[in-house]
Design a protein with these regions (language model features):
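N-terminal pro-sequences and low-complexity stem/linker regions of secreted or lumenal proteins
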Residues: 1-224
Length: 224
């Protein structure tokens, strides 16, 4: 009903308490002593929607507001990251949301879908560039997925979308044709962080092990 503008509220991101349990990924991190931080994800009106994020979110990072460019969000993240890096306190698990791949369609007075996606792509490139020049690059894994795969279904399969990996141990110039799911990404993050599976679904999922080298040391990335 929300999607069709017939009433209702957005059901995700902690908006409905009845749907929330205690097994979000952040809850598992907290239980196992893995530090974490969120930038925009599960944050509404400048406040986290889950108690587990209360002291683990960036207050200066803009949440869901499509009037704000993702390149602006990059600089918001950068300031916070630099402050944490300076005191050796960068959390092990971070979620960063650049939203403008979602676009606003052909809404009057708003940037075109091409402009929104270009802004989103540039912000992601700046993000990878900056991390790749940081002292923690060889210990970093970036997993990037689309919020929604826009502009219609994929030309091969409507269930298919893009996933990008970057990091010191990630193979360069490698295209993996293994049929992964979003749960595969979740399983990979669990293995990297030393977390147990949260459900039978991620326990049974294929991890992205084919995408990694046994040694790190890639040159820094530069966006263009």
């Amino acid at each position: 009903t929300s999607y069709g503008n017939r009433g209702g509220t957005y059901p995700g991101e902690g908006a409905r308490e009845v749907a929330n349990n205690k097994v979000f990924f952040w809850d598992m991190c907290k239980q196992k002593g893995v530090s974490y931080r969120t930038y925009g994800e599960f944050v509404s009106d400048g406040k986290p929607t889950l108690a587990v994020l209360q002291d683990n979110y960036c207050r200066d990072f803009t949440g869901w507001d499509e009037s704000v460019r993702d390149t602006v969000r990059f600089y918001q993240w950068k300031r916070d990251f630099d402050s944490l890096l300076a005191i050796n306190a960068v959390p092990r698990f971070n979620t960063v949301r650049f939203i403008n791949d979602h676009t606003q369609g052909l809404s009057l007075g708003r940037p075109t879908p091409f402009a929104h996606v270009a802004d989103n792509d540039l912000a992601l490139g700046m993000f990878v560039d900056y991390l790749s020049h940081s002292p923690i690059w060889n210990e970093t894994l970036i997993i990037s997925v689309e919020d929604d795969a826009q502009n219609g279904p994929d030309h091969v399969d409507a269930n298919r979308s893009v996933a990008l990996l970057a990091g010191g141990f990630v193979k360069q110039g490698f295209v993996d044709h293994t049929p992964y799911t979003t749960t595969s990404l979740l399983r990979t993050m669990e293995l990297v962080l030393g977390l147990p599976p949260m459900t039978q679904y991620d326990a049974a999922a294929n991890s992205l092990w084919r995408c990694f080298n046994t040694a790190s040391g890639h040159p820094p990335y530069r966006y263009r």
